[in-house]
Amino acid sequence: MSYLKDRDRGLILHTDVGIGYETPWRQVEALLLTAASRTSGLGDKPAPFVNIKSLGDFAVVYELNAPGGDPLTLGRQYTALHQNVLDVFNEHGVQIMTPAYEGDPPEPKIVKREDWYLAPAESKNP
């Protein structure tokens, strides 16, 4: 996690995800932007954007950049953004590969929607 502050632009939140080469980059970009759009408390200028940060040995590293809101709630903004990234990727069956990749599992490593609130998690409106 890192952030950048520019007097004219405000706070920009950054987060990285590594996704396998079998997932189209256009899909990954759309998923990350969807996660940003679901995150309350973020600003809208500049519009969220995605960079392809690196082409690794086993995964492409994408960087989501989104305008932050109140600097005093930075931790909550990152938490909400990361929760939405996890949910959106799970909803679409896309496995996040980082921080380490050891091989292709027989089944994708995602959390199915019906398992999002297993005990002791409290049920919330999905």
Regions found by a protein language model. Name each.
Residues M1-D6, L11, D16-T23, L33, ...:
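Solvent-exposed, non-transmembrane regulatory segments of membrane-associated proteins
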